[in-house]
Structure formats: C-alpha cells, structure tokens
C-alpha cells in the first residue's frame, strides 16, 4: 500500500523535512500495522536530522520514536492486540534471542535500535512494527498523551529505579525541568517520597516545574547552581542528580552532589564533552551512572501509573505532522515545556 509521510533525504535544518507518498509493505508474520494518530518529538529527532558520524540512515528516512495510534492489520502470526485497539509503541527494537534480551535487559542488546533513529520512525500515517512493541492503552489516554509517554517514561523509570534507586527522604536534583524526561523524573521521585530540586533557565518553566511537584527550582539564568543546591540541602549536597544536559552543568554537578551520591546521565543536549576532576569522584566516592532508554518490562511496569493518572504526560502543544518544520524550530529554540506532539490527520 501507499501512505503519506514526512521524510528527509539528507541531513540539515528543519527545511530538509518533506511530505512524501511512500510504499509500505504488508506487515510481516509477527508485525502489526498501526494507523498513526500522534507522534511525539524528542531531541533525538533534532540530532538525527542534523546528522553526525553515528547516524547511518537509509533514505528516505522517517524520524519519530514516540508513537500512538490504532491497530489496522495483523501479520499472520502476530498476537497480543486486535484490529481497532488503541495502542502506544515501545520504541526500542532488539534481537530477542541474546543473553541481554532473554534476561530482560533488551536495551543492552548489541543489535538494539530505536524507531526514528536507526530504524524507520513514526512521521507517517501508517507503520509496521513488531507485535511485542505494541501496548494497548484503551481510552484512558488521548493519542497525544499516549504518544508523549513511551521514551520519556522508559528513560525516567530506568534512571530513577534501576540506576539511582531513589529512596524516600532523599534529595534529588533534576536538570532541565522543561524536558519530557525531566517532567517524568520529577513525578516519579515525588511518588517515591523524595525531595526534588529542579533547574531551568526560564521563570515560566520554573512555575510549571513546581506545578508538577518540584519542591524548589533553581533559575540557572539568575542563581548560582551549586550554591542553591548547597542551601537547599544544608550544605550536604544532593543524594542524586539527574542530568541530560552535559557540558558545564554536568561538571558543576560533581561539586553539588553529596559524598557517596550518584549522578545519572542519559544524554547531553548542550554539550557531549565535560571536564571531570577525578578527585571529586574517587575521594568523595561519587557514582556516575550512564543510562539509555529502559527495557520493555519497564514500560509495562510503569503502565498502571500512566493509565490511572499518577504519572501525567506534559504536552506543551499539538502541531500537525505536515508542519513538522515549525515544530522542530520550536523544540530547537527551547520554547516548550514537556512534549511537542505531531498529530496525523
């Protein structure tokens, strides 16, 4: 069949995104065809579009890893869903047979791929995906809300529970409160019973961070980051710091974290390189933990919290897919709090 999509044929700015008619084969034996209704944006969309040595794309390439829609057709041996089901898509693809996959750590699979990054993504009306990646959500979430949750929830769940192992009463710092991942991290940490300090450069985003549970907000455009963390913690420093900014802010986190504390990093939206004074690490026994995505099981474990509203998607705006260029510009300009969602009419 043919369907419409936003694709790129080369790396570059938002202008490389073009609306095209593409061919889509029938779903494979263990695949499901989904009619896409919403696809949420991530910084990954910007990185892949801009290009770099890590991205080897098959053109025309479709961005978009966070997808929600309805099941249209099943492959011959597909199971778990039925035509008409409202679903979200788990964005991580793995081999399913290696030691990591079989032990429930599929995001450590050496053949791991992410929709929209190194596999064709959801900037399209229709998409074929493995049946094991399709999760029914019923009618408790809008398509925009369902699309806004998968990658952020996976990432936040692994950071909070698998890596940092946040406990009641601990003080945590969450960088870049306006991001989708950070908004989920804040909510999860509050559910655990932790005290949350968020950072942002915008007074408007500071108020929104408080609205979703942050106990204090450091306005990095006006306040000294380390001094404010020390003030809030009685000079002890934060038990856990969650970072996906990188660069200078990561460097300063090494001074703001408590003795024996943990820094969990899942990205570097500002800068990939940071200078690390190893004395701060070994002498103060600071743990630096890397984190990418989460397992399929993590999303299923988080699902009840998503469906009953204890964890809410923060959707800043909904934009038609065919206006993806404008949506990319908004995300690049950092004028959003939470997620930009592309609707597919």
Question: Across the structure, where does each feature detected by a protein language model lie?
Answer:
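Rossmann-fold dehydrogenase core element
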Residues: 259-266, 275-315
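Glycine-rich beta-strand-centered segment in the early N-terminal region that forms part
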Residues: 23-39, 52-102, 138-140
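C-terminal hydrophobic helical "lid"/dimerization subdomain
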Residues: 1, 9, 296-345
């Amino acid at each position: 069949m043919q369907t419409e999509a936003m694709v790129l044929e080369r790396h570059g700015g938002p202008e490389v995104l073009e609306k095209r008619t593409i061919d889509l084969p029938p779903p494979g034996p263990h695949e499901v065809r989904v009619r896409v209704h919403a696809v949420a944006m991530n910084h990954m969309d910007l990185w892949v579009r801009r290009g770099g040595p890590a991205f080897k794309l098959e053109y025309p390439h479709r961005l978009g890893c966070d997808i929600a829609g309805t099941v249209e057709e099943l492959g011959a041996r597909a199971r778990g869903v039925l035509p008409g089901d409202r679903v979200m898509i788990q964005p991580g693809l793995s081999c399913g047979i290696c030691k990591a996959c079989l032990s429930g750590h599929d995001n450590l699979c050496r053949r791991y791929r992410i929709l929209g990054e190194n596999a064709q993504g959801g900037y399209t009306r229709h998409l074929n995906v493995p049946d094991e990646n399709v999760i029914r959500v019923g009618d408790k979430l809008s398509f925009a809300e369902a699309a806004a949750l998968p990658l952020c929830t996976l990432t936040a769940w692994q950071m909070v529970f698998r890596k940092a192992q946040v406990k009641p009463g601990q003080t945590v710092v969450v960088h870049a409160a306006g991001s989708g991942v950070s908004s989920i991290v804040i909510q999860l940490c509050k559910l655990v019973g932790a005290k949350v300090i968020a950072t942002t450069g915008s007074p408007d985003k500071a108020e929104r961070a408080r609205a979703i549970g942050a106990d204090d907000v450091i306005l990095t455009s006006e306040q000294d980051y380390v001094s404010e963390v020390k003030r809030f913690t009685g000079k002890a420093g934060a038990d856990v710091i969650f970072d996906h900014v990188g660069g200078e802010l990561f460097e300063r986190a090494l001074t703001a974290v408590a003795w024996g504390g943990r820094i969990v990093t899942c990205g570097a939206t500002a800068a990939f390189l940071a200078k690390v004074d190893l004395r701060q690490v070994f002498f103060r026994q600071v743990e630096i933990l890397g984190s990418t995505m989460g397992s399929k099981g993590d999303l299923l474990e988080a699902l009840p919290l998503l469906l009953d509203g204890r964890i809410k998607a923060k959707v800043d705006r909904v934009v038609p897919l065919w206006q993806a260029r404008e949506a990319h510009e908004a995300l690049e300009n950092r004028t959003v709090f939470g997620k930009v969602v592309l609707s597919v009419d």
